[in-house]
């Protein structure tokens, strides 16, 4: 089930655009971060969306985009459940971050975060937060990555420990993220 908290989190960091635009990596995107280059709307999705919002309802672009985002999040959840057998055991906050990452960068790229996933599986929030920050994803999304690392850390002392480790081991990345830490 897709929580309201997850929807608000994704909306906050994706923002809404009712017209197609090029995202930060040059992909055509619309709505709340729907990459239409890699994931174009299928005719089935269009019909399904009209069923959800009503055939005779005037198109409200933001409402339509939110329904599309919810469908995409359901797809992410299905994929994560297939690839991460221990997903049901993580906290709601950790699941929120994994869902947000799966939505933002795609599940295949998320699965490449092996050290972060290993840390989550082993209940090591400091390492999980550090590994998220120690990534190209973090240098590209900055504020979103720092927010997700805070959530993974679980508390401010764990987050401080993760960021101190980043400053010591990866000062180049720390400097890029410092404004948001």
Q: How should these model regions be labeled?
A:
Residues 28-29, 36-44:
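Short, His- and charge-rich active-site/binding loops that engage polyanionic ligands
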Residues 51-54, 91, 120-121, 142-143:
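Short, surface-exposed linear patches
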């Amino acid at each position: 089930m897709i929580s309201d908290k997850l929807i608000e989190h994704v909306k906050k960091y994706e923002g809404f655009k009712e017209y197609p635009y090029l995202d930060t990596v040059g992909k055509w995107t619309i709505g709340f971060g729907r990459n239409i280059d890699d994931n174009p709307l299928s005719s089935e999705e269009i019909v399904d969306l009209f069923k959800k919002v009503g055939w005779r309802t005037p198109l409200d672009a933001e409402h339509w985009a939110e329904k599309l985002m919810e469908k995409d999040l359901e797809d992410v959840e299905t994929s994560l459940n297939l690839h991460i057998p221990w997903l049901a055991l993580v906290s709601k906050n950790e699941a929120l971050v994994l869902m947000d990452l799966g939505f933002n960068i795609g599940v295949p790229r998320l699965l490449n975060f092996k050290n972060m996933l290993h840390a989550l599986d082993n209940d090591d929030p400091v390492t999980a937060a550090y590994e998220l920050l120690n990534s190209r994803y973090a240098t590209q999304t900055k504020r979103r990555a720092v927010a997700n690392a805070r959530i993974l850390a679980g508390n401010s002392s764990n987050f401080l420990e993760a960021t101190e480790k980043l400053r010591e081991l990866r000062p180049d990345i720390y400097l890029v993220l410092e404004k948001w830490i």
